Amino acid sequence: MTFRGFIAVDVAGGPVLNAFAADLRRASPSLKVVDTDQLHLTVKFLGDTEEGLVPEIVTTIREATADLRPFEARVRGTGAFPSLGRMNVIWVGVDGAEPIARITDSLEASLEALGFPRERRPWKAHVTLARVKGRQDLDRVRRILEVHASEEFGTHTVDAVHLKKSVLTPQGAVYSVVETVRLGQ
C-alpha cells in the first residue's frame, strides 16, 4: 500500500497570517488557499511512499535531526513561484530555518538510497499559502503580495519534524501525521 508522503515542519497560523489568508481568499476565485490549520514547511516531498518504508524513513529523519534542538523560526514576507508575473504558488517566507536547511543534504542522500529521487531545485524555506488555479483577479493578488512583501506574520517554535501523508480531495489536500520525530530527544 502506498500514500502520498512528505517530510515537514508544522507552522502555526496566528491571527496576522489568518487575516492575510482571508484577504487572499476574498481577492480572487482563482486561488485555492490552504486552511491555516494545515500550514507547514515542506522539508522534502516524497510522492508515492510504500508503507513498509515508514520505519526506514523515520530512522533517516531521526539521524538527520540528531543534533538539532528546538528553535524559533519567523514567518515573514510573501512571494510567488515561479514569479509574481507568472504565479502558480503563493507563499510566505520563513526566517531562521537554517537548521532545517542544513539537514536537507543528508536527508536527500539517505532518501535517495531508499529510492526517492533527489530534488533538482535548491531548497527554499517557505510555506505554501495558496495555489493559483485560474487567472481571474490576479492583479489584485499581486498588489496584496506587494503590500505584504516584508510583513511579519509571527514566530513559531520548531520542535518536531513529521512524516506526513497527503490525501487529495476536491476541496484541496488533507494532511495527516504518519510519524513524528521530536527535536532534542
Mark where each language-model region is.
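Histidine-dependent nucleotide/RNA phosphoesterase domain, centered on the 2H-phosphoesterase fold
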Residues: 1-185
